[in-house]
Regions:
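Outer membrane beta-barrel
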Residues: 71-100, 109-224, 238, 243, ...
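Surface-exposed loop/turn segments flanking beta-strands in extracellular/periplasmic regions
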Residues: 100-109, 319-326
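Surface-exposed extracellular loop regions of Gram-negative outer-membrane beta-barrel proteins
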Residues: 122-144, 245-270, 346, 351-358, ...
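Detector for outer-membrane/organellar transmembrane beta-barrel domains
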Residues: 249-369, 375
């Protein structure tokens, strides 16, 4: 693993005065003429900018179609597209259950004789609709829909469905606590384990205060992952979470720094006292990206809080917002910290590389009731090369490393080498 990282690091330091790129981590989206107008006319760059702003901002969550219908007098832009992602991978070390998501917290011990596995996947392929009405007006209206094949038995599952009007975003998409544009680019569908990435029903208002300063505040649908015991039980949630952020951007938007926060109270039933109780949760995040020089840019985020496990990649499916304690009927929040840092280098307009490291730690209360296999901390390392043949076809290769340790001190390691072919239209 060290040799792999050193090789990529050395490559990234070469030619800083060469190709000058924006902070875009995915060179498949770099060209200004990536969207071809149909049944109407408008500058391709304008269509790209409008549809790109209407789509999710996470770098591996494509929502930019290659063709768009242009309404009369440019009253609307409508793009309907799809992306096929064919992936082949080889896993070695301990067992990584999913062929789609490389998640350190899900690593399980390898069975005797199962030291390696060759696997294939296509389920992260997607189709999407990106629509913006009155794109050159302050009253522009946007609708975005995206679905993948990640449901049970490869059924279609909606990953985003939301509308926009002026500064309002409402629907099923990322929480405002997620800084998608600050996440490093990965071929792995999951991405860095310590980053905030939560999709749910949300509504938030984003506002530009000046040319450089902006902010947002909203509400997220109330959810709670509570590890109850015999004296507690989950109840329906009543109070939505409140995410907000303040951001400063420069360099034409290629660099920014964002301070985010979230407040999320969660209710449960105290069976000992026959009444409902509340766990108070909340967290802060510092995130951003910066164009350093030439084709080199960096991304980072640092998150800390109580009862925010649902919002962190590695904790989102393991029920660790709050845990039962030795006091009957009493639950306490789990404290969590996530850290991510990544570098991107664009060698040419067609070839780019990304390397990253991410870490997540959970601190359980001293009187927590938890099994020895409860997730304590994990690490995630990824390095990739992505080559774009044209705006429709690209390919990439990536190495992923994951490490996890439970509260009993037992550790597991998993490795993956994967190649991806992407066809987008």
């Amino acid at each position: 693993m060290k040799n792999t990282l050193l090789a990529f690091s050395a490559a990234l330091t070469v030619g800083l005065t060469g190709f000058t790129a924006s902070a875009q981590r995915d060179n498949r989206l770099e060209s200004d003429d990536i969207v071809t107008p149909l049944l109407g006319s408008a500058p391709s760059k304008d269509i790209k900018n409008v549809l790109e702003q209407n789509a999710p901002q996470t770098p591996n969550d494509n929502g930019l179609p290659r063709f768009a219908l242009v309404g009369k007098e440019r009253q609307f832009y409508l793009g309907i597209g799809a992306q096929f992602l064919g992936e082949a991978m080889f896993d070695f070390g301990d067992n990584m259950p999913s062929a789609l998501d490389f998640t350190p917290s899900s690593i399980t011990p390898k069975a005797p004789g199962n030291g390696g596995a060759t696997r294939f996947a296509w389920q992260s392929s997607s189709f999407y609709m990106n629509f913006v009405a009155m794109p050159n007006s302050d009253n522009h209206i946007g609708v975005f829909l995206k679905a993948k094949f990640t449901g049970a038995n490869n059924n279609i599952k909606v990953s985003h469905f939301y509308g926009k009007f002026r500064g309002l975003t409402m629907g099923y998409t990322h929480s405002a606590f997620t800084d998608g544009s600050a996440m490093p680019m990965t071929i792995d569908s999951e991405g860095p384990n310590g980053s905030v990435s939560k999709t749910l029903f949300t509504a938030y208002w984003a506002q530009d205060f000046t040319k450089n300063f902006s902010g947002a505040i909203g509400i997220d649908a109330p959810i709670a992952d509570l590890a109850t015991a015999d004296s507690e039980e989950s109840v329906t949630q009543r109070i939505p979470a409140i995410p907000l952020y303040l951001q400063y951007a420069w360099d034409g938007g290629d660099s920014h720094i964002r301070l985010s926060g979230i407040y999320r109270p969660m209710q449960y039933r105290n069976l000992t006292e026959a009444k409902n109780s509340t766990v108070q949760g909340g967290g802060i995040q510092l995130s951003g990206m910066v164009h350093i020089a030439g084709g080199l840019s960096a991304q980072y985020d640092a998150t800390y809080g109580s009862a925010i496990g649902t919002y962190l990649q590695d904790d989102s499916d393991i029920v660790i917002d709050a845990v039962a304690t030795t006091e009957p009927g009493k639950m306490k929040a789990v404290k969590s910290m996530g850290l991510t840092a990544g570098l991107n280098y664009a060698f040419t307009p067609k070839l780019s590389s990304n390397i990253m490291y991410s870490h997540l730690t959970n601190w359980l209360p001293s009187d927590a009731v938890a099994g020895p296999d409860t997730y304590r901390y994990g690490d995630y390392v990824a390095a990739n090369l992505i080559y774009s043949f044209n705006k429709f076809l690209s390919a990439g290769i990536e190495y992923d490393y994951g490490h996890m340790k439970n509260i009993a001190g037992e550790g597991l390691h998993a490795n993956r080498i994967q190649a991806q072919l992407a066809v987008t239209f």
